[in-house]
């Protein structure tokens, strides 16, 4: 009987020591954000039948249970993906918004100063000084356009860099998760126990990769299989697949994301396939904010310069010569898909700038017919092919200079690409300024200047906007979208914090509770030590 008492006490001591070890580990890791609280699980030893009855044989330390709720953790992880998307989106929206409102002088104000100087020249067309001031203001306006264009192009390059960096991060996470799958499987096979510390690290990595790229996780035979973009495998068991930042086959100036498959074959993934995570936010900000801003500022420059040139050409300069183009302006481009098998070249021009939308287009050759869709909405556009060797649509004319397309060849038409880049004031001498309305007019003839001044108030863009109104609408659109994105981001972050609190209620360490448990274990240990 005495032996039984001592054995029972010893089993209790061993179990209590195990419990205290678990509690102390919880307390030590209380400040580790991804740590999951552990609980000691005890069992009752089988009893012994004796003539005097059935006697118990104490307790035993069974195992360490990791407090983990798969559903709550999945909610938190998915919420982090949405937060990551908004965070990256807002960051890039803010850059465009700052450019349009703070970083450079307001383009609308510069256009106003341009017409103010022009109106002053109209007050005394014979005053060379007033015309020189106007020409200086013209150069300042062109510089203003160019600076806005330069910064927007730099943002485009920065988007490419962001994509590269995100892809590098994703590949590192994938390798680490696959490595942990391998380590966890090895520990389980050798010891039969759960490597809770490794499980914690693996869940942390899944949460972190979800912040960068929205993923789905399926646990299979103890491994985490991680997929993204509608089912592409990022991690399968102990194997990690790779992504690659690559020039888009549609437009090699822009990066897309490729999936590296068997034999290192890279398959380009459509941008819209990415849902959640910072990478998705970067891609969305490019399509929804940066591209439209670039296109609209270049459209403003195109219509402004073209309409000014049209009126200037109707006047006469101080030498009685017909006015020439006042502004030089660039023209768009047509980009061939890298997978095209034929050879087709185009020369882009503008048949009617008032009809130009500013959007990009995708052209596809289907046998004997060219099909054109507007980007990014995919709306089919009617093409005028009445002129041989020419395609006309929405104010654009494409003359086919090399005509050897194959079935399925595609092209991206970028009507606004490079417009501002090649913009400059061509009239540098006041004597070349076509101020007069007639050839034989005197030095004070300002009739054509007055016609030029009228352009300021004419609704020449989209059939209903002045130059200043169009720019103000652009600024307002970007500002509104940025503000809404900030609100959405803040709301989503609060949801993520709420899910984290729910997760911590289950898996987090409560110092008070652990201290109470330690006291209880210590109290139960002391009587048994007396034996």
Predicted regions, residues:
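S/T-rich, low-complexity, solvent-exposed segments of bacterial secretion/appendage proteins
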Residues: 1-531
